[in-house]
């Protein structure tokens, strides 16, 4: 788990201007300095521990997470973190219905897989115009669904960076009762997420630090699951 010193060095404590605050974030605010709200880092640690414990338990049961962040400066970071812990990601644009209209989204994912598997031989049977249409379609599907390519069912955990920008994803999670973990700045609403993590959501250092901790928890859950299976196998071998 990270320390207060590490969080201070990564600007986790720096919130938005006082006039931009959401009163519902009051319990996570330590005070104000030079017109900015200062986040209570002890609260951040408590919230982060809750989120990490939830991730470890969930992953141990076989659940997988979907990372959501369409902020341009954080998209590459989010993708790297998601891949590091074998999770799914959305970093280009949240298409309405990714969760609430899952059947349509699943069809799009299957179409992407189908187009990716098509052999060069098949392409040679098409006209130049048909090949161009297919190429454009594949590129469009890849742009929006490459991070969900192996997702065969609706995710049971969604990790959101930037609540206000990803409000549609937040609402879909809320509507379906999907557990969401959200990095919340002082202008956000903690009542819209199951596991709020009060933190600066505008700093690459802050977001990177929080995501790394969440990523480690997911990998820890996976390792625990593997260990459990191995222990069961050893027990079975002894009995047989």
UniProtKB/Swiss-Prot annotation:
For the biological process aspect of GO, one term held by this record is:
translation
Indicate the principal place this protein occupies in or around the cell: plastid
Q: Is Cytoplasm there in the keyword field?
A: no
Name the PROSITE patterns on file: RIBOSOMAL_S2_1, RIBOSOMAL_S2_2
Sorted keywords for this record are: Chloroplast, Plastid, Ribonucleoprotein, Ribosomal protein
Under InterPro entries, the record lists: Ribosomal_uS2, Ribosomal_uS2_bac/mit/plastid, Ribosomal_uS2_CS, Ribosomal_uS2_flav_dom_sf
Q: Where are the transmembrane segments?
A: none
State the Gene Ontology terms under molecular function: structural constituent of ribosome
User: Where, per UniProt, does this protein localize?
Assistant: Plastid, Chloroplast
Q: Which domain of life is it from?
A: Eukaryota
Q: Name one GO cellular component term.
A: chloroplast
User: According to its UniProt record, which protein family does this protein belong to?
Assistant: Belongs to the universal ribosomal protein uS2 family.
What is the name listed in the Swiss-Prot or TrEMBL entry for this protein? Small ribosomal subunit protein uS2c
Organism encoding this protein: Euglena gracilis
Q: Which gene encodes it?
A: rps2
């Amino acid at each position: 788990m990270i320390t207060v010193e590490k969080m201070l060095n990564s600007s986790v404590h720096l919130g938005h201007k006082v006039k931009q605050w959401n009163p519902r974030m009051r319990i996570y605010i330590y005070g104000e300095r030079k017109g900015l709200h200062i986040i209570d880092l002890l609260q951040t640690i408590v919230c982060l521990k809750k989120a990490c414990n939830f991730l470890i338990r969930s992953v141990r049961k076989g659940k997988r997470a979907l990372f959501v962040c369409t902020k341009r400066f954080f998209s590459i970071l989010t993708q790297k973190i998601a891949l590091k812990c074998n999770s799914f990601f959305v970093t280009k644009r949240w298409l309405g219905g990714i969760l609430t209209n899952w059947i349509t989204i699943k069809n799009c994912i299957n179409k992407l897989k189908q187009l990716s598997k098509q052999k060069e031989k098949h392409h040679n049977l098409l006209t130049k115009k048909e090949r161009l249409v297919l190429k454009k379609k594949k590129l469009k599907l890849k742009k929006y669904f490459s991070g969900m390519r192996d997702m065969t069912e609706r995710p049971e955990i969604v990790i959101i960076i930037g609540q206000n920008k990803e409000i549609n994803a937040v609402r879909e999670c809320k509507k379906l009762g999907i557990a969401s973990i959200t990095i919340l700045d002082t202008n956000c609403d903690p009542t819209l997420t199951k596991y709020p993590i009060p933190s600066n959501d505008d700093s690459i250092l802050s977001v990177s630090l929080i995501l790394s901790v969440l990523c480690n928890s997911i990998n820890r859950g996976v390792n625990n699951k593997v260990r459990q299976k191995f222990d069961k196998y050893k027990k079975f071998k002894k009995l047989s």
